[in-house]
Amino acid sequence: MDTIDLGNNESLVYGVFPNQDGTFTAMTYTKSKTFKTENGARRWLERNSGE
């Protein structure tokens, strides 16, 4: 997980995060998507990280 502090009590995060329902959310600085598996989320993140 990477975090950018914007300095105004806000931040941007980047990475794969588990959800309470057993799914995973992959987040770039501009997009996010929910997946059933962590591997699927990590593959999507790799494909979409070159923005």
Swiss-Prot record:
It comes from the Bacteria. InterPro entries: DUF1391 (IPR009821). To E.coli YdaF. This is Uncharacterized protein YdfA. It comes from Escherichia coli (strain K12). The gene is ydfA.
